[in-house]
Every structure is written in structure tokens, then in C-alpha cells.
């Protein structure tokens, strides 16, 4: 159901983001968060914003200083429980907030006006596409300069300061431009509440002369941050459960597939519950890996059309009914729109909507409540899983390399698989790491993240920084190609400053391999770097870092043993040198199909 948003329509714009609206990522749906008591003298705008970030769990803010946000940064630093992390550039600060939100449920970044805001824009767009609540804070112009026809620095030379705001309007679910104190409290609280409720980024611009000022609205006690709960329409819920149960109970060999919107719906537990009670085999869409329990006894792998896990596509596409929870069917996840699925066989469950076959459709239904209720109505049916067991033949492990034989990528990932546990998390960069990491069977508690919808190469460096900062109980294992790394390498420096102990596998194959398989050309070849030498230079004997260049399996085994043993408390950077044409068979198949989809001729006019 839609909830009323309170705000100043001239400064804040509230709008529904899409159908992927679920329950809250950090706080419970009826949470009232009480701030600590403060005196009126200390109740400034900057402190109010900082305090709110701490209350929602964003206890680290990734920032790049600029003259418009310096005073605000002082207040963020001064807030107990809040840590300001300086990044090398705004893009990586945004990527770090993205990674942080994946682990913590919400992230935050702070940049300066326009030159910083437009630089972080790409990362915020990625967070929007992945349904991640990121609070993007911008230090804005002095409030006295609005409407004066003055031309300011850090702008495009026009007296109108709205260019940055207009850019953010399409990639955030709420925008607050705070250029007066009277409604600043309301605007900040509305923006943060909207980010949590919609699970999308928001934009908050704070005038550079306002952060240190007090206002009576900041000193009222208590000042709760109230998040209005989302509730299912009970009648619709009952009808939807009845229709879906009747549809699925008539099927002979139904299956279940988890999609990426399970995250925004906070439905991981509900999905696991219905999987347990129904007896159906469970698969996962590639963009939802890590959201579905792969240790479950009836887990059959990744459903990704022609590049699915062995025998998974055969079971899913031959089913006479499939329950998809939170799917996104884009050109990447559908392998160029080549999935062999039929809508009339599907029950599609989105975070707030259910569609049974070709109809009917039921709105205002929370995924969690629907799956919990449906689990009680389904007849147990293991037929599809029994079929899977009859045809399943385990994949063979790649043979061990010969002494001094050049290392192969499949050998690398065989050894990465052995590193995984509930105390690790995998970050997979856009590229061949997508396909190789999909084959990793995740143990219980092992995290997994990648950016499939937006697919911005270089994302994983900042995301590794943010995820590791948020999930300090896990050791992050990051797999990134050389081309992607050249986009965002600088913030390995920030990892060292933060004392992180991630393991980064830099796969050096001399170019943009994923682009080669879609459409080759000389533009896909890059200048080779001495990557370990670069990290050693960034390290500069300041921090805890270990690097290694690996060319053979024997060297890889030794490097992993060191990274997980003597150097377990270090940031470990392992450069893997492989042949430029050493790619997974899945990338070859996927690339050819996506290329075909991209090169379709125009429709006749």
C-alpha cells in the first residue's frame, strides 16, 4: 500500500520508485528510533544528520572533502559512533556505500556540490538499479546564494544551481535540498525514512553555511524516526495464496527459483521456509546468488538459461509450474532473451505483487507474508527433484596443472572454492568472474555480491572496501579483472588506511575479456601494468599489505597458504597471470547470445 510522505514539495520530491518495494532493510517495519538526549546548544543540523545515520546503522560514511562540505564533515567526525572514511575519488566513495549497504542494509557517502555530485552519480545509479538504500549527502552552496543570479565555482557557469538536482531526480527516490533551517529536520527525516522504506538511494543537499546552526526542531526530545510499516491487503493476500496454491498443487513437477528482489523484500527466511515445506527443487537466478541457501539439500544450482549450472536449466524449463520469487528478466540474466520459459506456467512473486500464470494479478501483498502463508497450503511434491537426482552427473574437477604449466582460470577457481566458509564473502567483478564465481558452491553463511543489473566495470574495488568495512566478521575474497581494476584501483589505498584484510585476486589476461566475447576490437586491449608493483607503491610501507605474482598452480597454492596463514591479518593482493583467451565456456556462450541480441536490425517501419 502507498504511504503518505511529508515534505516540502519545492525542495523534496517524493515518488514511488517501482514495484520492488519491500520491508525495511535495517529497522523493523514499525521501528521508532530514539536519539540520545542533547542540549539545545549542541542540536545543530550537522549533528542531527550525523545522529540519524548512526541510528539507522550507517556508522561509516565514505567521503571526499570539498569546500562546500567541510563544515558538515566536521560534524560527522564529531558524532560518537560515526566514522568518516576518506576515499580517493567520489565514484569509489559511492561504490563503497553500495557495498556497505549490501552488508549492513544501508550505506552513506558525502561529497561536494556538482563536481563531487556528478562524479558519484554513476555509483548512485548502480545502487538504484540494485535496490540499495544509499544516503548520498552533498555539501551545497551557501543558502544566501540561491536566487541571486550569482555564478559560483564548481558549477557549469550558470546562475541556476539545479543541474545536479535534476541529474539525481531520476536515480534517487527522494531529493532534499536544504537551504533553510525551518524544514531541515523534516526533510532529513523524510529522506532517510524514504530510503529505508523504498530501498533506493536518496539525495540530501545541505547548504554549506547551515551545518553548524541550531534550530528548535533539532532539540525536541524525544525526536523519533518513525518508519511507517508496509502491510499486505489481507483480502488480496488470501485470494493470492488460494490462487497460487491451487495452481501449484495441480502441477506434476513444480520448481522454485529465487531472484534478486528477495533482498529488498527481506524474504530470505520466508523463501527458505517454503523451500523446506514444499519439497520443490530450488534454483537461483545469477543476480540472486547469495540470497538463496546453497547448502539446502534440494538446491540444484544457478538458473541462467543456456549458461546454467549443469542440469539446472533442464529441470526448470521442463517443469509444468515454476514459482519465481523476486525475478528480474533483463537481457543479461535471460542470456539475450533466450530463456525457454512460458508465462502461463509461472507464479511471479514480486516484493509487493503476485501474478499467477497469465492472470490474475494481486497487488499490495508483501512477499514475506505471501510465501509464509503459501508454505502452509502447498502439497509436498519432490517429483522435479527426484528427476534431477536421476539425471545429475557431478562436474569433474579440472585436472591439476603440470609443474611450470601456465595457470588456467578454472584451476584458480577450484582453489578459491576451497577457501570459502561462513567467515568469508565473495565479491565478483563484472566480467568472466561472473561466470566462474557462479560455479562456487557457497557454504552456509558465506556472503556473495555482484552487480548484474548495472554491470559497471570497476565497481568491485569500492564495493570490496565498503563490504569489508560493514562486515568485519568476514574476510572478503574479491575477484577482479585487470581492465576493471584500472578503472578504480586507487582505493586499495583506502583499504590499507582502514586496516582491512581482504584477499584480492587480480586476474591479468591483458584486456576487457567480457567485451571481447561480445564484440572484439583493438579497443579491448589495454596497457599491461605491474599490478603488484602498483600496490607496493600504494602501500609505501604504511599499512599491512602483502602482494604476490602467480603464474603456476604450484605458486597459487603457496600464495593462498600464505594469505590464509602467515598473512591472514594483511590485505593480500595476488596477481594471477593467465592467457588472454582463457575464458569460461559460459562466457563464450553468453557473449555470443548477448551479441546477437545487441545486433538485431531495426524493426520494419
From Swiss-Prot:
It is an enzyme of class 4 (lyase). Substrate binds at residues 67, 154, 515. Homotetramer. Mg(2+) binds at residues 482, 509, 511. It comes from Oryza sativa subsp. indica. Binds 1 metal ion per subunit. Binds 1 thiamine pyrophosphate per subunit. The gene is PDC1. Keywords: Decarboxylase, Lyase, Magnesium, Metal-binding, Thiamine pyrophosphate. GO terms for cellular component: cytosol. Residues 432-514 are annotated as: Thiamine pyrophosphate binding. This is Pyruvate decarboxylase 1. Its cofactor is a metal cation; thiamine diphosphate. Belongs to the TPP enzyme family. One of its GO terms (biological process) is aromatic amino acid family catabolic process to alcohol via Ehrlich pathway. PANTHER family: PYRUVATE DECARBOXYLASE, PYRUVATE DECARBOXYLASE 1. GO terms for molecular function: magnesium ion binding; pyruvate decarboxylase activity; thiamine pyrophosphate binding.
Amino acid at each position: 500500500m502507498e504511504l503518505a510522505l511529508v515534505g516540502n514539495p519545492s525542495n523534496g520530491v517524493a515518488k514511488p520508485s517501482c514495484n520492488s518495494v519491500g520491508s525495511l532493510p535495517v529497522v523493523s517495519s514499525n521501528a521508532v528510533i530514539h536519539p540520545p538526549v542533547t542540549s539545545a546548544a549542541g542540536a545543530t543540523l550537522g549533528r542531527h544528520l550525523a545522529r540519524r545515520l548512526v541510528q539507522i546503522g550507517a556508522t561509516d560514511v565514505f567521503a571526499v572533502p570539498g569546500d562546500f562540505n567541510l563544515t558538515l564533515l566536521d560534524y560527522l567526525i564529531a558524532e560518537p559512533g560515526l566514522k568518516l572514511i576518506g576515499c580517493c575519488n567520489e565514484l569509489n566513495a559511492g561504490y563503497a556505500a553500495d557495498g556497505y549497504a549490501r552488508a549492513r542494509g544501508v550505506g552513506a557517502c558525502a561529497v561536494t556540490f556538482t563536481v563531487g555530485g556528478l562524479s558519484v552519480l554513476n555509483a548512485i545509479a548502480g545502487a538504484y538499479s540494485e535496490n540499495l538504500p544509499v544516503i548520498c549527502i552533498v555539501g551545497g552552496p551557501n543558502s544566501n546564494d540561491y536566487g541571486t543570479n550569482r555564478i559560483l565555482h564548481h558549477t557549469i557557469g550558470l546562475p541556476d544551481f539545479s543541474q545536479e538536482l535534476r541529474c539525481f531526480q531520476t536515480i534517487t527516490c527522494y531529493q532534499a535540498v536544504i537551504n533553510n533551517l525551518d524544514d531541515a529536520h523534516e526533510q532529513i527525516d523524510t529522506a532517510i525514512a524514504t530510503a529505508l522504506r523504498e530501498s533506493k538511494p536518496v539525495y540530501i543537499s545541505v547548504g554549506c553555511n547551515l551545518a553548524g546552526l541550531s534550530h528548535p526542531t533539532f532539540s525536541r526530545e524525544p525526536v523519533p524516526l518513525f518508519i511507517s510499516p508496509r502491510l499486505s491487503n489481507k483480502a488480496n493476500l488470501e485470494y493470492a495464496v488460494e490462487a497460487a496454491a491451487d495452481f501449484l498443487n495441480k502441477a506434476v513437477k513444480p520448481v522454485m527459483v529465487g531472484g534478486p528482489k528477495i533482498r529488498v523484500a527481506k524474504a530470505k527466511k520466508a523463501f527458505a521456509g517454503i523451500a523446506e515445506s514444499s519439497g520443490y527443487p530450488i534454483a537461483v537466478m545469477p543476480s540472486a546468488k547469495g540470497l538463496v541457501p546453497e547448502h539446502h539439500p534440494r538446491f540444484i544450482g544457478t538458473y541462467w538459461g543456456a549458461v546454467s549450472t549443469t542440469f539446472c536449466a533442464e529441470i526448470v524449463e521442463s517443469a509444468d509450474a515454476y514459482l519465481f520469487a523476486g525475478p528480474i528478466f533483463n537481457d543479461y540474466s535471460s542470456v539475450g532473451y533466450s530463456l525457454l520459459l512460458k508465462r502461463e506456467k509461472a507464479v511471479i512473486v514480486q516484493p509487493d505483487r503476485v501474478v499467477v500464470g497469465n492472470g490474475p494479478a494481486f497487488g499490495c501483498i508483501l512477499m514475506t507474508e505471501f510465501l509464509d502463508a503459501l508454505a502452509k497450503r502447498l502439497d509436498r511434491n519432490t517429483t522435479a527433484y527426484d528427476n534431477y537426482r536421476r539425471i545429475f552427473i557431478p562436474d569433474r574437477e579440472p585436472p591439476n596443472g603440470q609443474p611450470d604449466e601456465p595457470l588456467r582460470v578454472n584451476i584458480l577457481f577450484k582453489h578459491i572454492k576451497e577457501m570459502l566458509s561462513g567467515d568469508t564473502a565473495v565479491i565478483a567483478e563484472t566480467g568472466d568472474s561472473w561466470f566462474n564465481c557462479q560455479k562456487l558452491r557457497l557454504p552456509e553463511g558465506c556472503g556473495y555480491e555482484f552487480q548484474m543489473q548495472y554491470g559497471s566495470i570497476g565497481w568491485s574495488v569500492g564495493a570490496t572496501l565498503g563490504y569489508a568495512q560493514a562486515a568485519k566478521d568476514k574476510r572478503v575474497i574479491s575477484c577482479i579483472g585487470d581492465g576493471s581494476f584500472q578503472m578504480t584501483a586507487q582505493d586499495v589505498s583506502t583499504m590499507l588506511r582502514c586496516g582491512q584484510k581482504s584477499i584480492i585476486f587480480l586476474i591479468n589476461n591483458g584486456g576487457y575479456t567480457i567485451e571481447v566475447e561480445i564484440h572484439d576490437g583493438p579497443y579491448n586491449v589495454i596497457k599491461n601494468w605491474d599490478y603488484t608493483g602498483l600496490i607496493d607503491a600504494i602501500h609505501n610501507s604504511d599499512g599491512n599489505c602483502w602482494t604476490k605474482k602467480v603464474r603456476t598452480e604450484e605458486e597459487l597454492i603457496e600464495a593462498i597458504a600464505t594469505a590464509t596463514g602467515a598473512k591472514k591479518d594483511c590485505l593480500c593482493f595476488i596477481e594471477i597471470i593467465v592467457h588472454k583467451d582463457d575464458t569460461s565456456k559460459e562466457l563464450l556462450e553468453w557473449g555470443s547470445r548477448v551479441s546477437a541480441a545487441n545486433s538485431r536490425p531495426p524493426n520494419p517501419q
